[in-house]
């Protein structure tokens, strides 16, 4: 025991024996002896009370009957060196009393106890408490715990004590931990039923309506606490005019496809939002220079090189729902590499590339519909090319730049529709090997090579194309020039990552700030070392709802998927 601890122990002994005590704390019929000087040193409340003539200097009593006796007694013991004995039952009372008496160290100790012991069983209780007493630190932490555990909490006895204002805040949050937006109406209905409160338009506006299945929308229509409110039915009748919604963070998985340095195996990585790290979920033997397309949560990899020196016609796939590889897919019509991959609602497309027979460029575009036994010829580009950007926008296939005859880049931009090819505004510079994505109704490209003659200059350019005005816009450049990077979009933000920079594989990622028009190195999406990212795709979680007929207990059926 150090000297200060010994001193406070002696003073506490004086208090217990009544020596030198000059104040009595009165709470109803209970009295607590203390010393004004000691209380003033620990409590801002007592310091002001005793030093600013709020009470007569000769007054021997302070009445605090509006406070909890046990909490005040525990805190005065704490001031005199006796540790707080905190439990889930008493910590709220002690914290609110410490806050009233302005005992800073006790407040911190109580807050730390709550934060350490916060869980799904007590988060609603602590959230309601923190909201009442305006404790932002606990309110924020308990709110985040509610978001994380929301599907457990819909059957919690305290769920009904959340206010409509709190439910609006919960249902509006991007971090609401649901893997499919259909669970959001389930959460809403559970709260309405537990409170027997009629629905409001403000609550319905919190749902991402454009992402809901028809069955769940019908469940909303038919529920008595919704259908009985005219304004709610009017709102639901006009959902076709609402803007498209962005998925919540937990309703998508960010999946990357690339080559790791472990003998250059194909690596499938999933981004862990909690840990802010990429985790490999599967891998298979070597392949490179292949095309990638995603349809119905299945990642298709077409052509490229495998372990032989020859190009491949094989197509393999990875099912992100079952975490399994698929090998029984019809082969391409001929071996090719450095081709482009796309998908619409029905077909997978393999575009251009280099043929195996004589390493010549090809202009052919083939397509395949899953469940069909073979690939079909679909169209031909105006000229053979490889390593071009490809994008699907408004039902049209766009082919951007690429390498043409003579190993030079091209600046051509063309689109393919049922009426054939159409030329558009050329790129500001000849480019190839760039990443491409459709975001917010525009085509974005980044990185790659750019040169008017020999293909050898690594680019950090970022461009966007507006198909309505047929014009290119140059955006802020990347911090790191990259060949074959991955460009992706989640939650209305653009990211670029991976690729090769100065012949070195880079594991860095960058995030685009649209308002400031700048790219920032992103510490949260750092890739594994020596990893070439071919593509990064947000995968939406799906449940077999589209195959299920609507019934009156459809929401109960949906509830059976919680935890799966």
Curated annotation (Swiss-Prot):
Q: Which InterPro entries match?
A: BACK, BTB/POZ_dom, Kelch-typ_b-propeller, Kelch_1, SKP1/BTB/POZ_sf, Vaccinia_A55R
Q: Name one Pfam family in it.
A: Kelch_1
Listed GO biological process terms: symbiont-mediated perturbation of host ubiquitin-like protein modification
The UniProt record lists the BACK domain at 123-219
Tell whether Repeat is among the UniProt keywords.
yes
Which PROSITE patterns does the record cross-reference, listed alphabetically?
BTB (PS50097)
Chain ranges of the BTB domain: 21-88
Q: Which SUPFAM superfamilies match?
A: Kelch motif, POZ domain
The source's superkingdom equals Viruses
Q: Where in the cell is it found?
A: Host cytoplasm
What keywords tag this UniProt record?
Answer: Host cytoplasm, Host-virus interaction, Kelch repeat, Modulation of host E3 ubiquitin ligases by virus, Modulation of host ubiquitin pathway by virus, Repeat, Ubl conjugation pathway
What GO cellular component is one of the record's annotations? host cell cytoplasm
What is this protein's function?
A: Probable substrate-specific adapter of CUL3-containing E3 ubiquitin-protein ligases which mediate the ubiquitination and subsequent proteasomal degradation of host target proteins.
PANTHER family according to UniProt: KELCH-LIKE PROTEIN 32 (PTHR45632:SF3), LD33804P (PTHR45632)
Assembly, per entry: Interacts (via BTB domain) with host CUL3.
Per the record, the domain comment is: The BTB domain is responsible for the interaction with CUL3 while the Kelch repeat domains supposely serve to recruit the cellular substrates.
Q: What name does the UniProt record give this protein?
A: Kelch repeat and BTB domain-containing protein 1
Q: Which organism is it from?
A: Horsepox virus
Q: Gene behind this chain?
A: KBTB1
């Amino acid at each position: 025991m150090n000297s200060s601890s010994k001193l406070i122990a002696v003073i506490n002994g004086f208090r217990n024996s009544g020596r030198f005590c000059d104040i009595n704390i009165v709470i109803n019929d209970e009295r607590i002896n203390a010393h004004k000087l000691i209380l003033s040193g620990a409590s801002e409340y007592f310091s002001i009370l005793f030093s600013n003539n709020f009470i007569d200097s000769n007054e021997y009593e302070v009445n605090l009957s509006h406070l909890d006796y046990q909490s005040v007694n525990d805190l005065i013991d704490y001031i005199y060196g006796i540790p707080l004995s905190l439990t889930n039952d008493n910590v709220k009372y002690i914290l609110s009393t410490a806050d009233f008496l302005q005992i800073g160290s006790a407040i911190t100790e109580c807050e730390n106890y709550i934060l350490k012991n916060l869980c799904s069983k007590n988060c609603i209780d602590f959230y309601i408490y923190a909201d009442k007493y305006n404790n932002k630190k606990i309110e924020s932490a308990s709110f985040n715990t509610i978001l994380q555990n929301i599907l457990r909490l819909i059957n919690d006895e305290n769920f009904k004590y959340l206010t409509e204002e709190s439910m609006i805040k919960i249902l509006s949050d991007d971090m609401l931990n649901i893997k499919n937006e259909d669970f959001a109406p389930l959460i809403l209905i559970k709260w309405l039923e537990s409170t027997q409160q009629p629905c409001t338009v403000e609550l319905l506006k919190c749902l991402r309506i454009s992402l809901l299945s028809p069955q769940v929308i019908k469940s909303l229509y038919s529920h008595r606490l919704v259908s009985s409110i005219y304004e709610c039915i009017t709102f639901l009748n006009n959902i076709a005019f609402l803007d498209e919604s962005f998925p919540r963070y937990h309703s998508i998985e960010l999946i990357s496809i690339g080559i790791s340095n472990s003998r250059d195996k194909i690596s499938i990585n999933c981004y862990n939002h909690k840990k802010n790290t990429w985790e490999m979920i599967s891998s298979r033997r070597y392949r490179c220079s292949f095309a990638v397309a995603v349809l119905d949560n299945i990642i298709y990899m077409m052509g490229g090189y495998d372990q032989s020196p020859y190009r491949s016609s094989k197509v393999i796939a990875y099912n992100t729902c079952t975490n399994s590889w698929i090998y029984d897919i019809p082969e391409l019509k001929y071996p090719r590499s450095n081709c482009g991959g796309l998908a619409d609602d029905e077909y997978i497309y393999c575009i251009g590339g280099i043929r195996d027979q004589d390493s010549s460029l090809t202009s052919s575009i083939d397509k395949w519909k899953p469940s069909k036994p073979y690939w079909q010829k679909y169209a031909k580009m105006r000229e053979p090319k490889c390593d071009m950007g490809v994008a699907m926008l408004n039902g049209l296939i766009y082919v951007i730049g690429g390498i043409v005859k003579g190993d030079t880049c091209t600046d051509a931009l063309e689109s393919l529709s049922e009426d054939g090819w159409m030329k558009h505004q050329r790129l500001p510079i000849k480019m190839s090997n760039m990443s491409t994505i459709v975001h917010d109704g525009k085509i974005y490209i980044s990185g790659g090579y750019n040169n008017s003659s020999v293909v050898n200059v690594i680019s950090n350019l970022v461009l966007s194309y507006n198909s309505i005005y047929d014009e290119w816009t140059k955006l802020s450049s990347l911090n790191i020039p990259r060949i074959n990077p991955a460009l992706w979009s989640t939650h209305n933000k653009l990211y670029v990552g991976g690729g090769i920079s100065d012949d070195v594989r880079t594991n860095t990622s960058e995030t685009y700030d649209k308002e400031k028009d700048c790219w920032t190195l992103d510490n949260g999406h750092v890739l594994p070392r020596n990893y070439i990212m071919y593509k990064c795709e947000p995968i939406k979680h799906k449940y077999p709802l589209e195959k299920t007929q609507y019934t009156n207990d459809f929401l109960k059926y949906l509830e059976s998927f919680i935890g799966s």
